[in-house]
């Protein structure tokens, strides 16, 4: 059986010419030359979701904006990531994400390292055209470790995918459809798993938080040190957040 090597592909992104391997996702091709395309649902190593629509880009000869996280590069592709049409589309998506998002950044554990917060500053979506009353839902404690603040959730599905595809546990899923869709644990109102914390770590906002960390410190007050995980006998390397030590 012969191994067939795919030829490299030449594309242009924001006027920069680059050569990348065939089959590369456009979002990764942009990243390789320092062009950061925003995205909430995309995460390397996980299946493609295309849910948040924040990575929209303009591709020459295509009638509509395309999602960079699901588009594979093609020879001669000409891409624009920062034209006004793209920025306005991203701003509109942010307004929808913020429609029911609580304004609790000062007390949210993700404040200061929240990807939604960063994108709001970057695209100036601080003022919304929507005047509807926000739907408030009480926070839920799924386990001694995992807390879920539903109004903060932006339905990026990162937690569901990392739990299933990354950890092979499948303790998280979804319920309902459309605007009523939400993340749910495997036992309706509580979570039965090994409590590895991957869902908390991968959450781009403050929807999933740790019981040991909640409301105790701020991200910029922490320093990080390498250590060995004591969760089981495998001895995996991990990074520990430390304060006042």
Q: Whereabouts are the PLM-identified features?
A:
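Short structural boundary motif marking the start of a folded domain
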Residues: 5-11
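Short acidic, Pro/Gly- and aromatic-enriched capping/linker segments at domain boundaries
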Residues: 3-5, 234
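Ordered, soluble secondary-structure elements with a strong preference for glycine-centered loop motifs
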Residues: 20, 193-194
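Extended, non-catalytic structural segments that build the interaction scaffolds
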Residues: 14-16, 148-149
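Fe-S ferredoxin-like electron-transfer domains
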Residues: 53-192, 200-230, 234-238, 243-245
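N-terminal cofactor/phosphate-binding cores enriched in small/glycine residues
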Residues: 9, 16-75, 84-89
